[in-house]
Structures are given as structure tokens and as C-alpha cells.
Amino acid sequence: MTEFTVIAYEKEDGESPVEDFINALDVKMKAKMYGLLSILQEKGNILREPYSKHLDDGIFELRCKVGNNITRVLYFFYYEGKIILTNGFVKKTQKTPPEEIRLAKERRADYIERMG
């Protein structure tokens, strides 16, 4: 079985918007999100709904719900079992906002360009 490593995307200046997003969540949501990240690290590309869903062009969402609050963290798979978390948002609409998917794709392109 492949070993997976979960990595938070970092900008060139070292800032990690997705890490900042997760750390800013309320205590219960943050605890559940870290639990789901552990499951993602263990299961990797075999993780499916209700925890994970493929959105578009290799971008996936990790799905976290506490009460009526819904949070998503988008990610993609990279070489050698790396899972790169790109961005997170609080879900307020039925569909994932296209701008969040676009941001995930932009960060993926940036990551691949810088990491080779």
C-alpha cells in the first residue's frame, strides 16, 4: 500500500493560506478537519464520498461538516504519494464555487512549476 504525505501548499514567500484557513476554524471544525486529514493521509486516492469527492481535472475536495457548518479543503495528488492541500473555504452554496476550483488549479500549476 502506498504511503501518503499531506502537504499544505506554500506561496513563494512561505505563507500557507490553506494552513491559515484550517487554523482559523473553530475548535470543533478544526478537530474534525484534522481527523479527516489523517484519514486522507492513510487512505489517499482510495478515499471516497462522503469524505472526499473529485471535482474537476484532478482537483478533489475534503468534505467536513459540523452541525450546519460545512467546510471544504481542496487538494491534488502529486508524485510519490504527496497530497497537496491548496485552499479551503466555508461552503454556503450547493455547488463548489468555480473560483475556488480555479484557485486550486492555479496553486497546483504554481506548485508544479516550482517543485518540478
Where do the model's predicted regions map?
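Basic, Lys/Arg-enriched alpha-helical interface segments
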Residues: M1-I70, Y79-I83, K92-G116
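Conserved catalytic cores of phosphodiester-cleaving nucleases, focusing on short active-site segments
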Residues: T86
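Residue-level signal for short, function-critical loop segments
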Residues: F89
